[in-house]
């Protein structure tokens, strides 16, 4: 969420809008936004005492600033800031839903905000099913900031792999729902007859990281399945892959698929959440049912055994991300601006 908020604020400011933030005092965004030149108001929101103080503080900030729009991003800040905005008379209150998991109480979507934005159509459709009117919720995809092209990845040198080895890579935090074991189980049947095939995981997270290490050791495939842990040079590592695959079981959107396509990689993803919206099935990648090892194995085999298909899908994905700019910060700002103007006009009625 923090990355999305920072990119959105930066992109909206670039279009000439005045943007300020209200954060908890110890929030990670405080320093980052301040360093970027944004005004950041620090308001404590924990506990019942701070709830009342928070409503009063935010109301004062909104009245003094005469803001047109308040955008909230979690239940707590919606309950406090949206109520404050109602009291301050802020014209438009928008709640953003970042996650795909089930929502308990819908109060912070249907009562406090005037409108809702989501990170994928999948999440939008879920909220509509739960009672948010369709005309009051819009999808605004999360953007990625494209890194400079990588001339040569260090991945293969680090792992001792040859240029003609085939590397299937996955970048994801190590959680059970990310499907690391599913990906292992799908690729292992292909390894015996393909001695140059390797699987690389990038990402950390206990206890799944250690459990995955143990599972790989049990299979005796430590020289074919590589766990690199958390890395800060993901674009460098993506440039060393031949195929990107993530067998996630739950995902609101999945911008890592976009990052992989930006690197010119064909992608394999599971048909859950908003994943199908992140790439074009059959054109830039292959979509498979979740928890279906055979389908995942078949998709992997198609791309592993067909270099021409890899190149064709990789080129199409790179074009979609770089030339069409579907997931650029500028596109996010354009979409956000459009829905805000539309909703402000409706509210002014």
Describe each model-derived feature in a short phrase.
Residues 2-10, 166, 170-189, 199, ...:
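A conserved mid-protein helix/loop that constitutes part of the nucleotide-sugar donor-binding site
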Residues 16-18, 162-166, 180, 184-226:
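A conserved nucleotide-sugar
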Residues 21-23, 266-269, 279:
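Short hydrophobic beta-strand element within catalytic cores of glycosyltransferases
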Residues 85, 157, 295, 302, ...:
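A short, well-ordered alpha-helix in the C-terminal region of glycosyltransferases
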Residues 87-121:
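A conserved, positively charged/aromatic
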Residues 149-161, 214:
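A short helix/loop element that forms part of the nucleotide-sugar donor recognition site in Leloir-type
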Residues 230, 249:
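Aromatic "clamp/platform" in nucleotide-sugar-dependent glycosyltransferases that forms part
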Residues 281-282, 286-293, 302-307:
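Conserved acidic donor-binding segment of nucleotide-sugar-dependent glycosyltransferases
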């Amino acid at each position: 969420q923090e990355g999305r908020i920072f990119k959105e604020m930066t992109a909206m400011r670039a279009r000439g809008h005045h943007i300020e933030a209200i954060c908890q005092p110890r929030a990670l965004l405080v320093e980052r936004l301040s360093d970027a030149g944004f005004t950041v108001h620090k308001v404590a929101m924990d506990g019942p005492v701070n709830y009342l103080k928070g409503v009063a503080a935010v109301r004062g900030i909104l009245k003094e600033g005469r803001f047109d729009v308040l955008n909230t991003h979690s239940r707590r800040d919606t309950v406090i800031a949206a109520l404050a905005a109602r009291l301050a008379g802020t014209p438009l209150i928008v709640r953003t839903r970042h996650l795909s998991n089930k929502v308990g109480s819908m109060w912070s979507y249907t009562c406090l905000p005037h409108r809702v934005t989501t990170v994928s159509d999948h999440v939008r459709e879920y909220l509509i099913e739960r009672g948010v009117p369709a005309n009051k919720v819009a999808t605004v995809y999360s953007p990625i900031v494209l890194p400079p092209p990588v001339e040569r990845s260090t991945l293969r040198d680090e792992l001792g792999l040859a240029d003609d080895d085939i590397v299937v890579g996955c970048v994801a935090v190590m959680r059970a729902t990310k499907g690391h074991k599913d990906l292992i189980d799908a690729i292992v049947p292909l390894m015996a007859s393909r001695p140059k095939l390797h699987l690389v995981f990038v990402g950390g997270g206990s206890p799944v990281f250690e459990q995955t290490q143990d599972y790989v050791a049990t299979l005796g495939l430590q020289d074919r399945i590589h766990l690199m842990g958390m890395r800060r040079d993901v674009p460098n590592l993506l440039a060393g892959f031949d195929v990107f695959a993530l067998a996630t079981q739950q995902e609101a959107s999945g911008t890592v698929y976009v990052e992989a396509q930006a690197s010119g990689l064909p992608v394999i993803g599971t048909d859950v959440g908003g994943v199908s919206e992140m790439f074009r099935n059959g054109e830039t990648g292959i979509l498979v049912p979740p928890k279906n090892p055979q389908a995942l194995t078949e998709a992997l085999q198609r791309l592993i055994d067909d270099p021409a298909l890899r190149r064709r899908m990789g080129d199409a994905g790179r074009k979609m991300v770089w030339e069409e700019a579907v997931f650029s910060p500028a596109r996010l700002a354009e979409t956000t601006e459009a829905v805000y103007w539309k909703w402000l006009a409706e509210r002014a009625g």
